[in-house]
């Protein structure tokens, strides 16, 4: 069953035409908070920011048919490193789908040096990172993981 569900999810870079789907997904405050994503409270400012992210190719979408059910985001950091974040709608969580989606993303983008910060209480997200070769750098209330750079 899990492999069938993974096969139903398709990943690709999101483009400006995907803006309505991305905005609908990010409108779920509980989902964005659980992912540690802080968005502007002003809807116009939020839409402007997401439009810029789409134009810069920072968002990779996870699609179940025509429905956007998740996002993997990368944002440039200092010293040629990228911050990684991801979120998946609750209906699709708990089945290893994000682990598989991150693996697919990494295969499609093998040269990215990535760092991810995860709440210590978010064990599922930590498993996603560990299963995809991320190494724990710092542990506390927020755990920091890195992949692809010594």
Protein language model features and the residues they cover:
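Active-site rim helix/loop that mediates acceptor-substrate recognition in acyltransferases
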Residues: 38-57
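Acyl-donor (CoA/ACP) binding surface of acyl/acetyltransferases
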Residues: 1-34, 59-150
């Amino acid at each position: 069953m899990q492999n069938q569900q993974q096969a139903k999810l398709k990943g690709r870079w999101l483009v400006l035409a995907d803006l309505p789907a991305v905005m609908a997904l990010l409108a779920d405050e509980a989902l964005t908070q659980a992912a540690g994503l802080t968005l502007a409270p002003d809807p116009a400012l939020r839409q402007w920011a997401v439009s810029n992210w789409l134009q810069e190719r920072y968002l990779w979408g996870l699609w179940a048919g025509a429905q956007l059910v998740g996002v993997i985001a990368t944002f440039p950091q200092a010293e040629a490193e990228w911050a990684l974040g991801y979120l998946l709608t609750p209906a699709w969580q708990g089945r290893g789908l994000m682990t598989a989606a991150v693996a697919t993303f990494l295969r499609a983008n093998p040269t990215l040096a990535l760092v991810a910060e995860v709440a210590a209480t978010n064990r599922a997200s930590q498993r996603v990172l560990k299963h995809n070769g991320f190494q724990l750098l710092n542990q506390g209330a927020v755990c920091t993981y890195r992949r692809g750079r010594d």
